[in-house]
């Protein structure tokens, strides 16, 4: 008897055919990668196909692969990643679509298929600059409306470009260029043999 993941994998391959760019398993969950041009059609099939029935979109986020794998990665920079749930079949799926243009990343909006994608797509637009084509209200959701740039992109400086301060003369909050010096953030290395001052 086939396992639940094997059954889901077979159902996905049968339903989607050549639209599957890759289908991999890791940590007990399947990841389906599709082209941006097939993203919307595949999402509809995932929801409507009686052997799949992914009724819920649980999460959607953007990913910037610019420095992925210590720079060894050589593919599209931005992806939209969704996590789907089939309540009917009790299985989950990760759906990934890479935006073909790194300078202006665009993928289709999933709001018409799963309304829960609305604010998730706004967040990915705000933080990564991924444009979700067909979104009914694609505007910033976490940063200021006048914010310049997208703060979760790998090339965005940790200190940002501007800072806010209250100006007592103008009696309002004003923006000014950052006054702190950019610095390299070095990860802390924990030496296990001397951790907490203990010698092993």
UniProtKB/Swiss-Prot annotation:
Reactions performed catalytically: a quinone + NADH + 5 H(+)(in) = a quinol + NAD(+) + 4 H(+)(out)
GO molecular function, a single term: quinone binding
EC id: 7.1.1.-
Database matches in Pfam families: Complex1_30kDa
Keyword set includes Translocase: yes
Membrane disposition: Peripheral membrane protein
Record-linked SUPFAM superfamilies: Nqo5-like
GO CC terms: plasma membrane
Chief place of localization: membrane
Location(s), subcellular: Cell inner membrane
UniProtKB keywords: Cell inner membrane, Cell membrane, Membrane, NAD, Quinone, Translocase, Transport, Ubiquinone
Family statement drawn from the similarity comment of this UniProt entry: Belongs to the complex I 30 kDa subunit family.
PANTHER family attached to this UniProt entry: NADH DEHYDROGENASE [UBIQUINONE] IRON-SULFUR PROTEIN 3, MITOCHONDRIAL, NADH DEHYDROGENASE UBIQUINONE IRON-SULFUR PROTEIN 3
Function: NDH-1 shuttles electrons from NADH, via FMN and iron-sulfur (Fe-S) centers, to quinones in the respiratory chain. The immediate electron acceptor for the enzyme in this species is believed to be ubiquinone. Couples the redox reaction to proton translocation (for every two electrons transferred, four hydrogen ions are translocated across the cytoplasmic membrane), and thus conserves the redox energy in a proton gradient.
SUBUNIT field: NDH-1 is composed of 14 different subunits. Subunits NuoB, C, D, E, F, and G constitute the peripheral sector of the complex.
Protein name: NADH-quinone oxidoreductase subunit C
Organism: Burkholderia lata (strain ATCC 17760 / DSM 23089 / LMG 22485 / NCIMB 9086 / R18194 / 383)
